[in-house]
Curated annotation (Swiss-Prot):
PANTHER family: PEPTIDE DEFORMYLASE. It comes from Xylella fastidiosa (strain M12). This is Peptide deformylase. It holds the Pfam family Pep_deformylase. The lineage of its organism: Bacteria, Pseudomonadati, Pseudomonadota, Gammaproteobacteria, Lysobacterales. Belongs to the polypeptide deformylase family. Its cofactor is Fe(2+). The active site is at 137.
Amino acid sequence: MALLPILEFPDPRLRTKAVRVGVAEVVSSSFQTLLDDMFETMYAAPGIGLAATQVNVHQRFMVVDVSEEKNAPMVFINPEIVTREGDQVFQEGCLSVPGIHADVTRALSIVVRFLDRHGDEQQLTAEGLLAVCIQHEMDHLDGKLFIDYLSPLKRDMVRRKLEKQRRRAS
């Protein structure tokens, strides 16, 4: 297994729309290794979700584990939200936008259809943190970041803060 480099805002590759993954590819050993590498990268970061787009792989899949013990890994391949209900405001952060947190309104409950890591079709009802995480990671697959939900003024403040962090780091 290997740690993968995570793209950071404002890298334009984060804006790339991901393409669907073929079922034959899902079961390949190289794809399974990539999933394992993504989990290792997510846990090391540390994070609770990681979309393929964030590691410069522009295919529609993501890994998630919102458990406290980090023992409930979930893979979502070609995810689609079937239904959304209610609203919740959650303070979100992102491995691609380090050090920034902001309130984002998302659906309280979702039903998502997807392929699991074995290529089998699944359907899951998610609420709370899991629902937020799935919606956040699915946004990445569409080239969207959580900061896109902010006002232009707040987004500009985020950009300046990140530039300042990078200058300090170099």
